[in-house]
A protein has these predicted regions:
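Right-handed parallel beta-helix/beta-solenoid
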Residues: 24-52, 69
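Short glycine/acidic-rich loop motifs that flank beta-strands on beta-rich extracellular proteins
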Residues: 74-76, 97-98, 112-122, 143-151, ...
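Bacterial N-terminal signal peptides
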Residues: 11-21
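Acidic, glycine- and Ser/Thr-rich low-complexity intrinsically disordered tracts
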Residues: 96-107, 111-113, 164, 293-425
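N-terminal extracellular ligand-recognition/capping segment immediately after the signal peptide
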Residues: 35-37, 50-51, 59-99
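Right-handed parallel beta-helix/beta-spiral solenoid domain characteristic of secreted/periplasmic
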Residues: 82-157, 161-162
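Right-handed parallel beta-helix
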Residues: 89, 130-143, 157-164, 181-195, ...
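Bacterial N-terminal signal peptides that target proteins for export
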Residues: 2-13
Length: 425
């Protein structure tokens, strides 16, 4: 018995030493597109791009990234990291201070050329636990998309061989896959102009882990604004998602005739969720989609508006926000949710395109909808446009038109109704 206890103590001590050693060896690196050269990645001699450092990163490291536009190593448009790290953007070029959505924007994008990557812009898939964080990055896939015509009003899902262009990437901005028993955070990011089939933010929890998604602006994307996945298929030790103070606007269907995509938040089945103080607005389908029936989730103090078919869905039951407490079976402690005709300062040019786009059987959709403030004139009013007697016009042939970073950030700078959604960090 004594020997067994000694053996277990020795193994525990060794494990503690390994963890302590790993933390002690963690490095802090610096990246600047303006000054960067080589791989020292110090504050005085920063690297040029995150992609140039990936091979030397270890669990526990931190990468600080200065303002500027980053297209990835060799302009690949995608970075994939297999260790647990912190990625922190929004720094001044001398790393003296941060302003991620203002003066010191760290913009992750790419270029569209035949043969380039169409993967998620940033993929983080560690195998061990350490602090995992993506904070203060502006993800803009506009330059990576293939548009029909110079006005950039319609994305193309096909390659344009004559112009040496890839299809628009069918992936989003962030893909985070947690290992078992680990925690991770996505905060203070802007995700825009992505055209995924799945999530613009694709977040994968695992056994006994916690994934926090807070104060992000997710705007003008196809697919699901945030897709919460579970890698753990069990009713025990399900991964927990804490999704709070995010603003998710203009979630488009995959294309004009698609029957998928177009939700602010979509849920996998085997997970635990608390979503609070978010804005889920202008989804081509809905606000929160629980079609897979995640059990006993909490939606508290969220604002739903302008979604076309439902504010919340359980399997094939569509529910308006005013009916959550009566009609939903899988919600618990889900009070304080509401709707409001908010004013979204997204810019007049984009507002006119969005409100004037062609709609498929709009009248039929409105007739069966269980969503709040989803009428054509309500939408125009929230976008700051004059009301029209005839509803949505059918003369704008657009699909995911490119939105400027300035106009996007205007829509997320302050909370709506003083309480809901993100704000400038």
């Amino acid at each position: 018995m004594h020997g067994g206890l000694s053996g277990r103590f020795a193994r525990l001590l060794l494990a503690c030493c390994v963890v302590t050693s790993s933390a002690a060896l963690a490095e802090e690196y610096f990246v600047s597109i303006a000054r960067g050269k080589g791989k020292d990645a110090t504050k005085d001699k920063p690297a040029k791009d995150l992609g140039n450092l990936i091979a030397k990163l270890k669990d526990g490291d931190t990468v600080n990234i200065a303002e500027g536009v980053y297209a990835g190593r060799d302009e690949s448009g995608s970075d994939s990291i297999g260790v647990a790290v912190k990625i922190v953007g929004g720094w001044a070029d001398d790393f003296s201070g941060r302003d991620p959505w203002g003066a010191h924007r760290t913009i992750f994008t790419g270029v569209n050329t035949m043969g380039g990557s169409t993967q998620y812009r940033l993929i983080l898939s560690p195998t061990n636990c350490a602090e995992i964080l993506i904070d203060g990055i502006v993800f803009d896939n506009g330059p990576r998309n293939n548009y029909q015509g110079d006005k950039e009003l319609i994305i193309s899902r096909m390659a344009t061989a004559g112009k040496n262009r890839n299809p628009s990437p069918e992936s989003g901005a962030i893909k985070l896959e947690l290992p078992k028993k680990c925690a991770g955070t996505l905060s203070n990011n802007v995700v825009m102009n992505t055209a995924p089939t799945g999530g613009a933010i694709s977040a994968w929890g695992h056994q006994g882990g916690t994934l926090t998604i807070k104060n992000n602006l997710v705007i003008n994307n196809t697919g699901e604004g945030i897709f919460a996945y579970s890698k753990w298929k069990s009713n025990k030790e399900q991964p927990r998602f804490i999704i709070e103070n995010n603003t998710v606007l203009f979630s488009w269907k995959h294309d004009s005739i698609a029957t998928y995509g177009g939700n602010g938040l979509k849920l996998d089945q085997d997970l635990l969720l608390t979503a609070s103080n978010n804005v889920f607005a202008f989804g081509d389908y809905g606000g929160v989609d629980n079609i897979k029936l995640a059990k006993k989730i909490t939606l508290k103090d969220n604002l739903f508006t302008g979604n076309r078919l439902y504010d919340y869905r359980e399997f094939n039951t569509s529910v308006k926000v005013s009916e959550f407490e009566d009609e939903a079976d899988q919600l618990e402690a889900s009070t304080g949710n509401l709707t409001a005709e908010i004013k979204v300062p997204v810019g007049e040019a984009f507002a006119k395109l969005y409100a004037g786009r062609k709609e498929i059987s709009r009248a039929a959709v409105d007739a069966k909808a269980k969503a709040s403030n989803n009428g054509a004139n309500a939408l125009r009013g929230m976008l700051g446009l004059a009301l029209q007697a005839n509803g949505v016009a059918d003369d704008a042939d657009v699909w995911l038109p490119r939105l400027s970073i300035d106009d996007a950030i205007k829509a997320g700078t302050t909370k709506y109704e003083g309480k809901y959604g993100c704000q400038k960090p």
